[in-house]
């Protein structure tokens, strides 16, 4: 009986571990950047932006998020430096998936409404 209970606890905690692989620093940076661009009052935007990063963290691992963000941001660099990412085979698809992930999180958390 105890073994079943322990196994049940382990299985139920697995999704939470995935959602919590984002470092605190990364979450805070996201929330601060999000709050800066939000037109909502400060406390409201803090809750909505916190919701957004939690939603993103529930969908992708932190390493994947870093890769998506890096490519999406590098594509916007003008000139040859950004050209490396723009010329990459899947660069634009990666950037699009990053934007879709952010848009879904914002919609889920009622950001910019």
Q: Which role does the model predict for each range below?
A:
Residues 56-113:
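Compact alpha-helical subdomains of small soluble proteins
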Residues 1-2:
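N-terminal secretory signal peptides that target proteins for export/translocation
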Residues 15-19:
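Sec/Tat signal peptide C-region and signal peptidase I cleavage site
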């Amino acid at each position: 009986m105890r073994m079943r209970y322990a196994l049940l606890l382990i299985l139920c905690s697995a999704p939470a571990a995935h959602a919590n692989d984002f470092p605190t620093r990364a979450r805070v940076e996201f929330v601060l950047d999000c709050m800066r661009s939000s037109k909502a009052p400060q406390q409201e935007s803090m809750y909505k932006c916190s919701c957004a990063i939690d939603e993103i963290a529930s969908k992708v691992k932190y390493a994947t998020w870093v890769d998506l963000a890096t490519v999406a941001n590098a594509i916007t660099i003008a000139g040859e430096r950004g050209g490396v990412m723009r010329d990459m085979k899947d660069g634009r698809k990666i950037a699009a998936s990053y934007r879709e992930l952010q848009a879904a999180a914002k919609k889920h958390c009622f950001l910019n409404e």
